[in-house]
Amino acid sequence: MSKLGALLTICLLLFPITALLMDGDQPADRPAERMDYDISSEVHRLLERRHPPCCMYGRCRRYPGCSSASCCQGG
């Protein structure tokens, strides 16, 4: 029975030490790796600001993103 108790004690002492993250493994300590997951508007295409389309419902509208009134041609 004492062998089982000793084995259980050793297992309980060793497992939490290996299961916890060490300070060096924290994402805050690795800025280069954090940049891979950056979802700022400069990187993520779904967050980009887009101009409204020039041609809506068959009419050509003037928006700051449109260069001329002929923006609907070819569409």
Swiss-Prot record:
Pfam families in the record: Conotoxin (PF02950)
Q: In which tissues is it expressed?
A: Expressed by the venom duct.
Drop me one GO molecular function for this one.
ion channel inhibitor activity
Disulfide pairs?
54-66, 55-71, 60-72
Q: Where does it primarily localize?
A: secreted
Q: Which family does it belong to?
A: Belongs to the conotoxin M superfamily.
Q: What does this protein do?
A: Psi-conotoxins act on postsynaptic membranes, and act as non-competitive antagonist of nicotinic acetylcholine receptors (nAChR). Is more toxic than Psi-conotoxin PIIIF. In vivo, has paralytic activity when injected intraperitoneally into goldfish.
Identify this protein by name. Answer: Psi-conotoxin PIIIE
> Whose protein is this, by species?
Conus purpurascens (Purple cone)
The opening ranks of the lineage are: Eukaryota, Metazoa, Spiralia, Lophotrochozoa, Mollusca
